[in-house]
Amino acid sequence: MLLKTVLLLALASQVLVLENGLLRKPPMGWLAWERFRCNIDCSEDPKNCISEQLFMEMADRLAQDGWRDLGYVYLNIDDCWIGGRDAKGNLVPDRKRFPHGIAFLADYAHSLGLKLGIYEDLGNFTCMGYPGTTLDKVVQDAQTFAEWKVDMLKLDGCYSTPQERAEGYPKMAAALNATGRPIAFSCSWPAYEGGLPPKVNYTLLADICNLWRNFDDIQDSWRSVLSVLDWFVTHQDVLQPIAGPGHWNDPDMLLIGNFGLSFEQAQAQMALWTVLAAPLFMSTDLRTISAQNMDILQNPLMIKINQDPLGIQGRRILKEKSHIEVYLRPLASEASAIVFFSRRMDMPYHYHSSLARLNFSSSVVYEAQDVYTGDIISGLQDKTNFTVIINPSGVVMWYLYPIRKLEIPQQ
């Protein structure tokens, strides 16, 4: 019994030292996958293939079009960059598409005030069939990424067994930390185990990973957004408590600026991902994105809410028969983010409510700012009736903050 206790304590101490101190707020940036997938035909489609040129052009846009200054600093490579391994077993990029190498791209990103993320897979192959990181290559690959001055690693889980994942993800976390370079760690481990306990140990994940994918890949459609949202809401009692500074649930990329969402739905995804304290990884063509979609993604108040220092993940607190849902995220300085979300598909809906219905204090007077319109609603008390008009598959989002406390008469 004593030996068992000592072993458990030793394992616990080993896990705790993997904490790397990174990503105290949800990471923000750009990720190639959803928009550009595994397009490797640079002869047919040179502007959109997975290549050095694509990432340099996206880096330029991040730096020059205001994204970096708002916090979108990660430039993340996904699958299909690998050319193979050299004679020493080190990973090398595809030399035609990445002629100057990954270290060159990292230096380029850093010169613009950005960070570079890279992708690998714990298994024999990546999801698209490129060389993966087997257990015997974990330490070697971590060292390679550090030598390239990479700032984030996304480690996928295709072609691996549950046993390999249970060994490999903690091993990679330790290997990254051992390099001495601060490399944020994005894990896909829980997504391959069904996303829920008992197969997923979220306490362990929070110690070894900075963010993790729990559910299916998002696709460029409203149906896919709702599928992800529904899974997160259904399991919010499990997922919400484990998220926080340095360890985030990741519902996957933002689709805004692509082809599958209406304007209202784009606003809705941005608001809902923000209230979930989600990483904000765009995956769109920043060279051609519309001004309307830029406005959604570059909304300063939205970003302030997403980056709130408390790092509390929000929850759905009401589901009405009218197909209106209300989400709440507690923020610093006793503020809150509230999202009124319509699943209706017919016409704008007049939703009537009060702060009392949302369990706000009766001793405080609040003010709300509409996150998208900027309108201010003053003098809100718990019993103040209000109406918000929500478009089909759209949202109204409030940033609610106290302006004064009321004197409550002594009984």
UniProtKB/Swiss-Prot annotation:
Pfam families hit by this protein: Melibiase_2 (PF16499), Melibiase_2_C (PF17450)
Superkingdom classification of source: Eukaryota
Binding-site list for substrate: D78, D79, K154, S188, R213, D217
Residues modified as Phosphoserine: S322
Keywords linked to the UniProt accession: Disulfide bond, Glycoprotein, Glycosidase, Hydrolase, Lipid metabolism, Lysosome, Phosphoprotein, Signal
The reaction(s) this protein catalyses: Cleavage of non-reducing alpha-(1->3)-N-acetylgalactosamine residues from human blood group A and AB mucin glycoproteins, Forssman hapten and blood group A lacto series glycolipids; a neolactoside IV(3)-alpha-GalNAc,IV(2)-alpha-Fuc-nLc4Cer(d18:1(4E)) + H2O = a neolactoside IV(2)-alpha-Fuc-nLc4Cer(d18:1(4E)) + N-acetyl-alpha-D-galactosamine; a neolactoside IV(3)-alpha-GalNAc,IV(2)-alpha-Fuc-nLc4Cer(d18:0) + H2O = a neolactoside IV(2)-alpha-Fuc-nLc4Cer(d18:0) + N-acetyl-alpha-D-galactosamine; a globoside IV3GalNAc-Gb4Cer + H2O = N-acetyl-alpha-D-galactosamine + a globoside Gb4Cer
Glycosylation (residues): N124, N177, N201, N359, N385
Keyword Lipid metabolism: yes
Enzyme category, top tier: hydrolase
Cysteine-cysteine disulfides: C38-C80, C42-C49, C127-C158, C187-C209
Broad class of the protein's primary localization: other
Active-site residues, as the UniProt record annotates them: D156 (nucleophile), D217 (proton donor)
Quaternary structure and partners: Homodimer.
Task performed by this protein: Removes terminal alpha-N-acetylgalactosamine residues from glycolipids and glycopeptides. Required for the breakdown of glycolipids.
Protein name, UniProt field: Alpha-N-acetylgalactosaminidase
Organism: Bos taurus (Bovine)
